[in-house]
C-alpha cells in the first residue's frame, strides 16, 4: 500500500490548525503558607487587586496584597481545608454579588449566597461589590423625607432620602431598635405609588453579630410583613473576617441596583465598628503597617468609599436614591475615638444615644443636644417643619433650666412654665419599640405638646394620654390622618382648625 504525501500533509495541517483549541488556559499559583484566614501564593503574576481566586474544594479567596515575590489572599471560608503546595486558580473576575428585586425577602451571606433555605435566588444581574461612588454631577441635594416613624428623630433630627445619618452609642442603648423601627415604618408608605409615595426597599447588613440575634430580627421582620421589601445580608461573628469586611460592600452593590434604576433604597450597616475590627485583623495578618489604635492607615478610606455610594441622583440619572444608616458602637460614650470620629466626619449627621437616658426610661435614648442632621431639614414635610421648629429649642432651654432649678426653689412663673412644659415634652418623646407612627400622627402629637394641650396633664399620665389620643385619631379621625398623609401642607388655616377640633374632641372624652 503506497503512502500518499498529500494526504499526510492534509492531516498534519488539519491537526496543527485545531491544535490547542480545546486546551483551557488558566494561570495557576501555589500556596506557600496558610493560616489565620490568609494564604500566601506564589506564581499568580498577572492577578489583579481585588480579584477572586479559587482554591481546591471550591473555596474562594480575594487578592489584597500584591508583592514582588508573592500575593496575599484573604480566604472566604475555612482555611483548614487548604494546605501548603495546593494549586490556586485565577478566576479573572473581581468580587461580584447578585442584585435585583429577587433578593427581597431573602437572607444571604457576604457573597450573595442564600442562607435561608428557600432555594436559589435567580437574580437578574450581578454587580461588582466594591465600585466607585457616583461623581458630583449625577447627584442632587437631598429633598425628600425618609420617615423613621420615631417622634424624636422625625421632628428634631430628620433624615432625607440619599442622606447618610450615623446612629452612634454604647452597647445596649437601642441602636438596632431605631434602625429596625425605620424598616417597619416603611409598611405605612410602601405600595402607595398612586398617592405619590415611592417604595423604599430596605437592606439590613449584620456584621459580626450573634446568629441568634440575626434570627430574631428576621423573625420580627417576617411577623410584621416587612420582609417583603427587605433583604438581610449576614456576616455573623462566626464567619471569617474577610466575610465581615466584604458584607457592607456587597450589600451596597445590592442597594445600588435600586438607586441606579430610579428606585429608592435604605441600607443599614449594623455595625461598622466590627467591620473596622475585621479589616484591622486582615491588615495586620497581611503585615500592613499599623497606625492609630493598630488600625491600618487606610481605615478612613474603608468607610468613606463605602458611605459615599449612598446618594440622591438627579432626574437625568433616574432620580433614584440610596439612604444609609451606619451604626457605630462606642466604648463608655467616647465619641472621640478613632473610628467614631472618622464616621462622624463622613456622614451627614448623627443620632447620639446615651446609656444614662436609656436607664432613666427615656427610650429611644436620643440626646437631642448632641444629635444633628446636616441636610435633613430640607427633606422635612411642610406639616412637620411647621410644628417641630419650637420643640428642639424648648427641650434645650428645659435641660439648661433643669440644671439650675436643682439649686434654687424660688422660681418665677415663666421659668416654672418652661420646666413644666419641658418635662411633658420629654415624656411625649418616649416611644415603645416596634410601634412606629405615621408622619400625620407625629405632627398632631407634637402640635398638642407645643400648644399647651398637655400642660394640665400630670407628667406620669402623659404616655397614657398620648396612647388614648392615637386610638381616638385612628378610630374617629382616620380621614384627617389620610388627608394629611396624601396632601402635605403647612399646619395653618383649615388644617390647623381640623387638628384643634380633633384635640378638643379628644380632651372631652379623656376628661
Swiss-Prot record:
Its EC number is 7.1.2.2. GO terms for cellular component: plasma membrane; proton-transporting ATP synthase complex. The keyword Transcription regulation does not apply. It is a peripheral membrane protein. One of its GO terms (molecular function) is proton-transporting ATP synthase activity, rotational mechanism. It catalyses: ATP + H2O + 4 H(+)(in) = ADP + phosphate + 5 H(+)(out). Keywords: ATP synthesis, ATP-binding, Cell inner membrane, Cell membrane, CF(1), Hydrogen ion transport, Ion transport, Membrane, Nucleotide-binding, Translocase, Transport. ATP binds at residues 169-176. Disulfide bonds: none annotated. The record marks 371 as: Required for activity. The keyword Amino-acid biosynthesis does not apply. It is an enzyme of class 7 (translocase). It is found in: Cell inner membrane. Belongs to the ATPase alpha/beta chains family. Produces ATP from ADP in the presence of a proton gradient across the membrane. The alpha chain is a regulatory subunit. NCBIfam families: atpA, PRK13343.1. F-type ATPases have 2 components, CF(1) - the catalytic core - and CF(0) - the membrane proton channel. CF(1) has five subunits: alpha(3), beta(3), gamma(1), delta(1), epsilon(1). CF(0) has three main subunits: a(1), b(2) and c(9-12). The alpha and beta chains form an alternating ring which encloses part of the gamma chain. CF(1) is attached to CF(0) by a central stalk formed by the gamma and epsilon chains, while a peripheral stalk is formed by the delta and b chains. This is ATP synthase subunit alpha. The gene is atpA.
